[in-house]
């Protein structure tokens, strides 16, 4: 089930939302059957875009760092989900080693880590933090905005196990996307559970592969509801050898962008949508970066436009050689007249909350994950009513967060498919 949270949606329920609300029993059963066959990622967050005529994920994060954006009222849901996840993986667990990323000076990130520590502590675990920084030899206090502190400690590796001094955990939880590579200290941990697995990190993971999996999931789900999968699936393309410094190196991007735009134009014509389609170009194996938005491939003939767009894709001083070309989904949602996009947060197979990412200086077709963005937590709606299939729209106080919970879980299920396909230790059968 999905918690009943407030959203920025105030207008009438559209056809897509109504269909999802009315299909709730079939949807929940379908998810139950899928989770019998597939293992959900340990935790996930999904960035969604709601165009009114279409609702789709545009990014799925397997090392979410946004738990600080959940309201305190969401904590019991997160704790219950964490307990369920731990009981499946290591029911006898008493110690959890949490390994954060290097953003130890980012107060918002530290608040997210603090929230994770709180969740797993209340789930019945002793939680301590370990650092991948080999130069750290003594415990390092990390001050928090509320006056508290986190203690980051040096890791201790012994054969097939990883821990801290006088601390031997059953499970090691990564909150680090490994964009800088896989440290040797994390390899060959055969005696412990490492979650998420190493192949969930960016050295292996590709957004293109994820959205291929999502397309498969969306087609299955759309067939269940008797609707066009395009309504919940962003069309995408991929380029594996891109050189932003060379015009010849952009030919693939031009071809893929042209193909995606042509497909979207046909869909817009089919549904009578009077908007100009666009695509976004983003790094295929990284997150937390900008994107390049294109409405016409001729924009790539302008060297200044290309250079400006390439700078937006920078990470670690280098532009990506692999890119995803994704159908742009405009956002119809506003908070205080600023463009907003919902983010759904999940632990195990459960939706534990959500929030809006808001940017007052960005348009409906632009990426909101940039400096200047703010975050608006979603609170519980008044009352605890469930969606009532068949009720007249507006008469049953429907859970308008429900459709976000559905699409978020579809993205999580796609991540499960993706991780199964890339598991280096998966058994194969001829």
Label each residue range with its predicted role.
Residues 1-38, 220-230:
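Short glycine- and acidic-rich boundary segments immediately preceding or forming the N-terminal edge
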Residues 2-9, 35, 63-97, 359-430:
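C-terminal active-site "lid" helix and adjoining low-complexity regulatory extension at the edge
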Residues 38-67, 282, 328, 340-349, ...:
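Conserved metal-phosphate-binding beta-hairpin within the catalytic cores
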Residues 47-52, 62-64, 102, 154-156, ...:
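Short, flexible loop/turn elements at secondary-structure junctions
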Residues 49, 54, 262-265, 271-277, ...:
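Phosphate-binding site of ATP-dependent enzymes
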Residues 80-81, 104-121, 126-276:
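Conserved N-proximal alpha/beta basic substrate-recognition cap immediately N-terminal to
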Residues 95-98, 172, 279:
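Conserved hydrophobic helix-helix packing surfaces used for dimerization/oligomerization
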Residues 237-252, 278-305:
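Glycine-rich phosphate-binding loop of ATP-grasp-fold ATP-dependent ligases
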């Amino acid at each position: 089930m999905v918690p009943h949270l407030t959203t920025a949606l105030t207008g009438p329920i559209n056809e897509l939302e109504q269909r999802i609300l009315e299909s709730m029993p079939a949807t929940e059963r379908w998810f139950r059957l899928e989770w019998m066959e597939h293992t959900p990622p340990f935790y996930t967050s999904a960035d969604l875009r709601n165009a009114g005529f279409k609702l789709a994920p545009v990014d799925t994060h397997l090392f979410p760092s946004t738990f600080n954006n959940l309201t305190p009222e969401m904590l019991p849901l997160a704790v219950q989900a964490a307990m369920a996840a731990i009981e499946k993986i290591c029911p006898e667990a008493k110690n959890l080693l949490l390994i954060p990323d290097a953003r130890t000076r980012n107060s918002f990130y530290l608040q997210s880590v603090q929230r994770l520590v709180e969740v797993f502590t209340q789930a019945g675990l002793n939680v301590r933090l370990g650092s991948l920084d080999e130069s750290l030899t003594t415990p390092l206090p990390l001050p928090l905005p509320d006056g508290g502190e986190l203690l980051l400690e040096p890791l201790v590796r012994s054969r097939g196990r990883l821990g801290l001094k006088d601390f031997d955990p059953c499970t090691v939880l990564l909150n680090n996307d490994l964009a800088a590579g896989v440290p040797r200290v994390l390899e060959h941990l055969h005696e412990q559970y490492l979650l998420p697995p190493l192949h969930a990190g960016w050295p292996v993971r590709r957004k293109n592969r994820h959205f291929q999996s999502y397309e498969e999931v969306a087609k299955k789900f759309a067939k269940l509801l008797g609707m066009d999968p395009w309504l919940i699936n962003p069309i995408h393309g991929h380029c594996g050898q891109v050189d932003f410094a060379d015009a010849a190196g952009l030919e693939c991007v031009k071809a893929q962008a042209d193909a995606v735009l042509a497909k979207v134009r046909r869909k817009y014509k089919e549904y009578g949508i009077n908007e100009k389609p666009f695509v976004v170009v983003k790094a295929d194996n990284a997150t937390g970066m900008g994107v390049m938005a294109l409405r016409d491939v001729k924009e790539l003939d302008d060297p200044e436009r290309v250079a400006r767009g390439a700078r937006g894709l920078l990470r670690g001083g280098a532009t990506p050689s692999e890119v995803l070309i994704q159908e742009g989904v405009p956002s119809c949602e506003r908070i205080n007249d600023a463009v907003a996009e919902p983010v759904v947060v999940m632990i195990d197979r459960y939706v534990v909350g959500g929030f809006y990412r808001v940017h007052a200086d960005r348009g409906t077709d632009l990426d909101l994950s940039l400096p200047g963005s703010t975050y608006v937590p979603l609170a519980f709606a008044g009352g605890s009513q469930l969606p009532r299939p068949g009720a007249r729209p507006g008469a049953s106080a429907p859970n308008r967060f429900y459709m976000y919970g559905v699409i978020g879980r579809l993205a999580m299920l796609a991540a499960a498919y993706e991780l199964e396909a890339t598991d280096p230790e998966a058994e194969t059968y001829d």
